[in-house]
């Protein structure tokens, strides 16, 4: 029996006041619908039907490389009508899981519980109890022996509910698991004879009850999982809820967060034990932090690996880089893609490293650019050092071997190699290879001019 997931993503989202389709608005730098697609994959979907309408070009540009079956809903005539567009792609023996592209926080564990709750050849509905159920369809039950809550017999929408039904606080989330054969039959019988003039997907529950099909329910751990976003205020609320959830995961995994409400997690972060994370840190992409790592305030980490006991000092940007054991960067350091700091290496304030390896124990304390370079162990890079790697057309490599001392304000014009133990005098411009243990100074000879008069301002 295959799991066929139908994701409804056809709405425009007028209240977002945006040209972007509603489901493409982001939570943690990922579109809402992408969150839903990712969760569908996690529960083992065999096929995903994406029902789309407004903004097709933008949707396909964002999602088009994925294994999705694109199903057009040319007119938005209700949720039942939307699912019906996917009917030709549903096999009789499929289990159909219906999800929503603007409900991004639904959890894998919740969907697994819903699928487990579905009776054989029956229907499972995800419901939630709300103190204020205004606007939602209510779950209608009838007393049944052996079922404390009673048997589900239907779902009534807010505008069609009686005064008594409006008192019900168990609401329909719209998420359900349905057998394929029966779903297609029920969809063909839907009517739009209701206050909205739409084809309600919820009407299939009354049909299931009338046909004697077993109906069961499951509930999420938190109601926020089934909240949607219809405007930017709600989008921001979901963002905060997502961030709180991800921060909690980090703390449970062994990280200390100085303030869990002031962290942004926009990717997959893996942490070791006793990690310390200060305020206003941003994580993007895939980030791995080893044991006893310290991240300073305001740091941004993107697609990087940080080994045990390493430290990222405040306001540093680490992107596509690796830090070895006990290495450190910052404050105000920038490591660009391809940068690698070996064990105990240090990059200080206002140092930029790009596509360069900094060897064991090597240091560049301040104000340097190290690009397209291989730097050995025990090297000292003075302030103001620049590897001149670009000739206007191509990038060239600088090699600095072990135990080299580079004086301040030195320019290394690549391609160039500095041999082991060499010393480069401050203010030098190095254009040729330097041998082992050589001292090289290329400064202009200092001149002393006596009797010189400093210019003075001309009075107007």
UniProtKB/Swiss-Prot annotation:
GO terms for cellular component: cytoplasm; membrane. It catalyses: alpha-D-glucosamine 1-phosphate + acetyl-CoA = N-acetyl-alpha-D-glucosamine 1-phosphate + CoA + H(+); N-acetyl-alpha-D-glucosamine 1-phosphate + UTP + H(+) = UDP-N-acetyl-alpha-D-glucosamine + diphosphate. It is found in: Cytoplasm. The active site is at residue 366. The keyword Cytoplasm applies. Its EC number is 2.7.7.23, 2.3.1.157. Keywords: Acyltransferase, Cell shape, Cell wall biogenesis/degradation, Cytoplasm, Magnesium, Metal-binding, Multifunctional enzyme, Nucleotidyltransferase, Peptidoglycan synthesis, Repeat, Transferase. Its main location: cytoplasm. In the N-terminal section; belongs to the N-acetylglucosamine-1-phosphate uridyltransferase family. This is Bifunctional protein GlmU.
């Amino acid at each position: 029996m295959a799991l066929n997931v139908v994701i409804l993503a056809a709405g425009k989202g007028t209240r977002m006041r945006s040209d972007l389709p509603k489901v493409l608005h982001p939570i943690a730098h990922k579109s809402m619908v992408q969150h839903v697609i990712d969760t569908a994959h996690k529960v083992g979907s065999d096929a995903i039907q994406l029902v789309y309408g407004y903004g097709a070009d933008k949707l396909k540009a964002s999602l088009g490389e994925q294994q999705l079956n694109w199903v057009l809903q040319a007119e938005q005539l209700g949720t039942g009508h939307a699912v019906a567009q996917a009917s030709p792609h549903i096999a009789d023996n499929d289990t159909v899981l219906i999800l929503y592209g603007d409900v991004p926080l639904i959890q894998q564990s919740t969907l697994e519980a819903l699928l487990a709750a579905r009776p054989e050849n029956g229907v499972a509905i995800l419901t939630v109890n709300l103190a204020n159920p205004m606007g939602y369809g209510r779950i209608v039950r009838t007393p049944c022996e052996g079922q404390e809550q009673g048997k589900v017999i239907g779902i009534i929408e807010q505008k069609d509910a009686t005064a008594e039904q409006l008192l019900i606080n168990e609401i329909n989330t719209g998420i359900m698991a349905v057998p394929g054969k029966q779903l297609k039959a029920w969809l063909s019988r839907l009517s739009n004879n209701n206050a909205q003039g739409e084809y309600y997907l919820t009407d299939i529950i009354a049909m299931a009850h009338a046909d004697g099909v077993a109906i069961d329910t499951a509930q999420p751990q938190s109601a926020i999982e089934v909240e949607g976003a219809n405007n930017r205020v709600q989008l921001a609320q979901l963002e905060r809820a997502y961030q709180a959830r991800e921060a909690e995961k980090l703390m449970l995994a062994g990280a200390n967060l100085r303030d869990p409400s002031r962290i942004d997690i926009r990717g997959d972060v893996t942490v070791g034990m006793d990690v310390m994370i200060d305020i206003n840190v941003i994580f993007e992409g895939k980030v791995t932090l080893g044991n006893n790592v310290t991240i300073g305030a305001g740091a941004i980490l993107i697609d990087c690996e940080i080994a045990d006991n390493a430290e990222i000092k405040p306001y540093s940007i680490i992107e596509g880089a690796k830090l070895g054991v006990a290495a450190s960067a910052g404050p105000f350091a920038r490591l660009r893609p391809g940068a690698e700091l070996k064990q105990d290496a240090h990059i200080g304030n206002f140092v930029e490293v790009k596509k360069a390896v900094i060897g064991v124990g090597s240091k560049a304390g301040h104000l340097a650019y190290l690009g397209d370079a291989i730097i050995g162990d025990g090297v000292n890079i003075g302030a103001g050092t620049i590897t001149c790697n670009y000739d206007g057309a191509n990038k060239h490599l600088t090699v600095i071997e072990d135990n080299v001392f580079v004086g301040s304000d030195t320019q290394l014009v690549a391609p160039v190699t500095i041999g082991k133990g060499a010393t480069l005098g401050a203010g030098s411009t190095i254009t040729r290879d330097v041998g082992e243990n050589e001292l090289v100074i290329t400064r202009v000879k200092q001149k002393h001019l006596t009797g010189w008069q400093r210019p003075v301002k001309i009075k107007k």
